[in-house]
């Protein structure tokens, strides 16, 4: 730009400007990287604070649901309070980092930009004064007779160059001083913030550690064993009660099964009662209750025979009163008719041969049982007989 032989002082000034420009660029690049790193730390701490809130919530939920271990419940509640307070301090630290660290570092971008612009303007002003000083020197060398005006202009140019150089020095010095002061303050603030956080956390964690140490494992385990014993006793009582009820029901069922079916007294339904009231006998047991096993077997055989005969009568459906009525002696009362027009059957088997009657008188008499048909089968056969008697057409 200028010849180094005549204006040698300009070389040193230009070197200083070059150095300060490099310093500004380095400072801006590294401080912006530090700002982004501190911002990342702040965001991570905010997530860490949210994680502490979730941890406190889960521990509190377990402490509320715990009902047996009392000391454990108290220790968990103390730990929940400690975690909650630590989360609150983390929230305060997040706000402090945002205001005192990240925002302060972000201002260095504007500082570097303004310093670079001021330095450029100062260098331009200095170059103008240097050019003017060069012109005055050339004019003085050409017109050596009248040098008073040239000397005064040259002096003014020199003063302007000195002023611009001083301004450049002030810009460079102010930038360096502010950079050093602000960086020192920012790093100190970060350290103090971390120390306060860890100091409070140490106090809280110390108290929580003492509370956790007061958990009595033995007493809690004894309470658990007592609860289990009471639960087992209640369960055993319930099972014993169920077994007792079941045994009673089974005994009653077994008693019902042990009783002979012949000794059971069947309950008459409404139809059976009507038939009995109409004159149709369902059957009567004339045997005493202390019958032997042989009599029971004979009665079972007779019941089977009567059932078979009743089935045959129902299938044929052509029996009449003359066929069914046995030959009765003359001294017997004539049979009555029921509401259906049927005659009552004889209650005992009177039809017998003389030999059988003689043997019956000689042999010990056994209680005879009436051969009774099923009431519903008797009704069916009577109905068929009445249809034939009154010539009712069948459908």
UniProtKB/Swiss-Prot annotation:
Give the protein name, as stated in the record. Answer: CBY1-interacting BAR domain-containing protein homolog
Q: Please give the residue ranges the record annotates as the region Disordered.
A: 240-375
GO biological process: what's one of them?
cilium assembly
To which protein family does this belong?
A: Belongs to the CIBAR family.
Keywords recorded for this protein, A-Z: Cell projection, Cilium biogenesis/degradation, Cytoplasm, Cytoskeleton
**Places the protein is found:** Cytoplasm, Cytoskeleton, Cilium basal body
**Top-level taxonomic group:** Eukaryota
Q: Name one Pfam family in it.
A: FAM92
Write out the function statement from the record: Component of the DZIP1-Fam92-Cby complex which promotes ciliogenesis in sensory neurons and spermatocytes by acting downstream of Cep290 to initiate early ciliary membrane formation and thus transition zone (TZ) assembly. During spermatogenesis, also regulates distal elongation of the basal-body and their docking (anchoring) to the plasma membrane and as a consequence, regulates the initiation and proper elongation of axonemal microtubules.
Q: Which phenotype arises from disrupting this gene?
A: Viable but displays adherent transition zone (TZ) assembly in sensory neurons and spermatocytes. Consequently, adults display phenotypes associated with ciliary dysfunction and disorganization, such as reduced geotaxis response and decreased male fertility. Some mutants also display, reduced scolopidia cilia number, deformed axonemes, excess accumulation of material beneath the ciliary membrane and deformation of the ciliary membrane. In spermatocytes, some centrioles are undocked and display irregular distal ends or microtubules extending from the distal ends.
Q: Where is the composition biased (Low complexity)?
A: 352-368
Q: What is its main location?
A: cytoplasm
Comp. bias regions, Acidic residues: 288-324
Q: In which tissues is it expressed?
A: In neurons of the second and third antennal segments, expressed at the tip of the dendrites.
What InterPro entries does this protein's entry cite?
Answer: AH/BAR_dom_sf (IPR027267), BAR_CBAR1/2 (IPR035590), CBAR/FAM92 (IPR009602)
Q: Which GO terms describe its cellular component?
A: ciliary basal body; ciliary transition zone; cytoplasm; dendrite; nucleus
